[in-house]
Amino acid sequence: MVYKLVLLFCIASLGYSVEYKNTICPHRQDYRYWYFVAELTIGVNYDINSTIIGECHMSESYIDRNANIVLTGYGLKVNMTIMDTDQRFVAAAEGVGKDNKLSVLLFTTQRLDKVHHNISVTITCMEMNCGTTKYNSDLPESIHKSSSCDITINGSCVTCVNLETDPTKINPHYLHPKNKYLYHNSEYSMRGSYGVTFIDELNQCLLDIKELSYDICYRE
């Protein structure tokens, strides 16, 4: 009888010990597995003609369950935060497309879909047409997605912004480091798209990432 009571106690203790708890990925400088979480396209009203090696710099942090990345390059500062999340940013790359469009590839430790997230993006003009806040509102979504996104644009250099989350395509010519492994969403219905434009139709802000060359943003 005593043996049975001890066994029941052990089973109950084991069941209690595996109760779900929130955890996060430990901080590393050399994550090997990159998930392609978002592609951000930004149009500007000054000339950017080609991808420049070493132009983009990045810093990332994870504080109070908020994942943040800050990118600088091509006259812009891009600050993105994913709120209340277990994931963190691991890398980014930037490339220049036609008609003065900048494409930003963002990589994290896991995907966005099936979990509601609040995403905040701030884009600041650093060199040309700097000035007061031009736009501060929710970023309209053109494809239904569970995440919500707000954007702030400081300065008048930005002509359009398009954000695609959990993209289903990744540039096959993107030259990522050989010791990294890239993953991306394969379910078309789970991707999201948000955009705003100031001078052109929004579809003019879309780029075929297969036509671009990218350079990885250097960590600061």
Swiss-Prot record:
<comment type="subunit">
    <text>Homooligomer. Interacts with host CD80 and CD86 when secreted.</text>
</comment>
<keyword id="KW-0964">Secreted</keyword>
<keyword id="KW-1038">Host endoplasmic reticulum</keyword>
<dbReference type="InterPro" id="IPR006971">
    <property type="entry name" value="Poxvirus_M2"/>
</dbReference>
<keyword id="KW-0732">Signal</keyword>
<comment type="function">
    <text>Plays a role in immune evasion. When secreted, inhibits T-cell activation by preventing the binding of host CD80 and CD86 to soluble CTLA4 and CD28. In the infected cell, may inhibits host NF kappa B activation.</text>
</comment>
<keyword id="KW-0325">Glycoprotein</keyword>
<dbReference type="Pfam" id="PF04887">
    <property type="entry name" value="Pox_M2"/>
</dbReference>
<keyword id="KW-1100">Inhibition of host NF-kappa-B by virus</keyword>
<comment type="similarity">
    <text>Belongs to the orthopoxvirus OPG038 family.</text>
</comment>
<feature type="glycosylation site" description="N-linked (GlcNAc...) asparagine; by host">
    <location>
        <position position="79"/>
    </location>
</feature>
<feature type="glycosylation site" description="N-linked (GlcNAc...) asparagine; by host">
    <location>
        <position position="118"/>
    </location>
</feature>
<feature type="glycosylation site" description="N-linked (GlcNAc...) asparagine; by host">
    <location>
        <position position="49"/>
    </location>
</feature>
<keyword id="KW-0244">Early protein</keyword>
<keyword id="KW-0945">Host-virus interaction</keyword>
<dbReference type="GO" id="GO:0044165">
    <property type="term" value="C:host cell endoplasmic reticulum"/>
</dbReference>
<feature type="signal peptide">
    <location>
        <begin position="1"/>
        <end position="17"/>
    </location>
</feature>
<protein>
    <recommendedName>
        <fullName>Early protein OPG038</fullName>
    </recommendedName>
</protein>
<keyword id="KW-0899">Viral immunoevasion</keyword>
<feature type="glycosylation site" description="N-linked (GlcNAc...) asparagine; by host">
    <location>
        <position position="154"/>
    </location>
</feature>
<dbReference type="GO" id="GO:0005576">
    <property type="term" value="C:extracellular region"/>
</dbReference>
<dbReference type="GO" id="GO:0085034">
    <property type="term" value="P:symbiont-mediated suppression of host NF-kappaB cascade"/>
</dbReference>
